[in-house]
């Protein structure tokens, strides 16, 4: 077990700051929701619609940028430090292009928003919010590229410090622009977009300055010279990153589809489902951080041409994710009523939500396993097949089963519980498939590297 404990330490060392960063991003969104909600119902609704659109698009594009981590991680393990700097400069062109494209989409989102059957008092806030935040997503894309570069070399603490500072700065900026403090215009929910853009710019500049002056990055010479866009690097990023982005989109679309299917059952069901999903998402940050850490750790070891240790790291990731998931499940089951009570005091919503978070507790195990496997597979630069397996698991199994059980069941419709049954079945199928894929990739890499560099007799 000593070899696994060593990898546990490595994953925890890399993963804890990543967890802190993810928590900071989540709290930033929660701050926007709380402050906009106190400005008025329309402001909250407008912000909710705006973030629903922007987050879905952003998570797809951020998946593409996540390709930077395994690319850098493998080069770092191979000690090709100057090539890391060269790759970063070339990938920044890709990130800038994606960021500008996103900004263009959000700035012109009114074409789609105005077609929705939503009150104009809400859509006007949504449109103005998306315009305000549009250039901010460009800054976030550049920040994410630099973040993944840093994390690929195991330097995760600086990203956490900057993300945490950004979260703290977002609070006063929200108050200033939402409520019109200190002579600023009172913008309501739109003010959250202004605050997000300012914070994103400061975070981007902060990480750029830190990387420029910290001795940790000097050996890669990230900004020592100018590099033109590279077609080969662009293809590499898109080949690796597009499946990651599509995989994230497939997963998000399953949750969105579940909400749409349940929407016909009334506001109590929708509200209860939203509470349960939100709780599951918060606990999901633990395996997410471990999975992202594994992408770095496994990538480093593959770069070192050490497939045996990479296999141990990947196995340790799964073990750590299972342990974390079981702890999460115990917490959810033990304190379920209390946690739900923090979200709502309405008795019908509370009662149904309490029953649903029992499913959220079961949800943790397959969700944790799949996140650990996905993270490890990214470290091996294996992203296309996992995306196909994800599509099959969620849209061939989870959604049809969930829809049938919700509306028909076995004699009686199961309602929201049926949808959760379907999602758990789909997740369980994918967790098994992803483990099988990981085992195959690990064995293939051991064979390939042993042929390339046979052990001395």
Each model region followed by its residue ranges:
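Short runs within selected transmembrane alpha-helices of multi-pass transporters and secretion channels
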Residues: 65, 133-151, 159-167, 192-208, ...
């Amino acid at each position: 077990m000593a070899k696994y404990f060593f990898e546990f330490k490595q994953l925890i060392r890399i993963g804890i700051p990543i967890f802190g960063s993810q928590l900071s991003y989540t709290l930033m969104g929660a701050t926007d929701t709380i402050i906009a909600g106190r400005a008025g119902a329309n402001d909250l609704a407008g912000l909710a619609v705006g973030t629903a659109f922007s987050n879905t698009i952003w998570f797809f594009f951020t998946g593409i940028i996540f390709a930077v981590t395994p690319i850098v991680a493998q080069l770092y393990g191979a000690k090709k430090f100057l090539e890391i700097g060269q790759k970063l400069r070339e990938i920044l062109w890709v990130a800038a292009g994606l960021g500008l494209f996103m900004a263009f989409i959000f700035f012109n989102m009114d074409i789609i928003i105005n077609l929705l059957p939503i009150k104009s008092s809400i859509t006007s806030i949504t449109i103005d919010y998306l315009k305000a935040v549009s250039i901010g997503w460009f800054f976030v894309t550049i920040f994410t590229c630099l973040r993944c570069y840093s994390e690929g070399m195991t330097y995760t603490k600086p990203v956490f410090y900057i993300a945490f500072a950004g979260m703290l700065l977002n609070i006063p900026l929200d108050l200033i622009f939402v409520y019109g403090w200190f002579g600023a215009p009172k913008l309501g929910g739109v003010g959250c977009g202004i605050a997000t853009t300012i914070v994103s710019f400061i975070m981007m500049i902060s990480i750029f300055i830190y990387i420029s002056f910290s001795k940790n990055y000097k050996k890669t010479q990230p900004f020592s010279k100018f590099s033109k866009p590279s077609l080969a690097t662009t293809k590499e990023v898109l080949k690796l990153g597009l499946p990651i982005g599509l995989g994230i989109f497939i997963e998000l679309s399953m949750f969105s589809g579940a909400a749409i299917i349940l929407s016909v059952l009334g506001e109590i069901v929708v509200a209860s489902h939203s509470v349960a999903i939100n709780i599951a998402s918060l606990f999901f940050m633990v395996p997410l951080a471990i999975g992202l850490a594994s992408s770095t750790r496994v990538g480093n070891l593959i770069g070192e041409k050490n497939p045996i240790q990479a296999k141990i790291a990947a196995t340790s990731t799964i073990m750590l994710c299972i342990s974390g998931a079981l702890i999460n499940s115990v917490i959810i089951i033990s304190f379920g009523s209390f946690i739900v009570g923090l979200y709502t005091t309405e008795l019908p919503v509370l009662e149904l939500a309490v029953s649903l978070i029992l499913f959220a507790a079961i949800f943790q195990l397959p969700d944790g396993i799949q996140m650990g496997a996905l993270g490890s597979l990214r470290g091996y630069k294996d992203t296309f097949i996992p995306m196909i397996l994800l599509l099959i698991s969620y849209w061939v199994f989870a959604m049809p089963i969930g829809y049938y059980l919700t509306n028909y069941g076995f004699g009686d419709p199961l309602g929201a519980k049926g949808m959760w049954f379907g999602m758990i079945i789909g997740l369980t199928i994918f967790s098994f498939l992803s483990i099988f894929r990981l085992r195959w990739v690990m064995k293939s890499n051991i064979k390939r590297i042993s042929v390339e560099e046979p052990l001395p007799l």
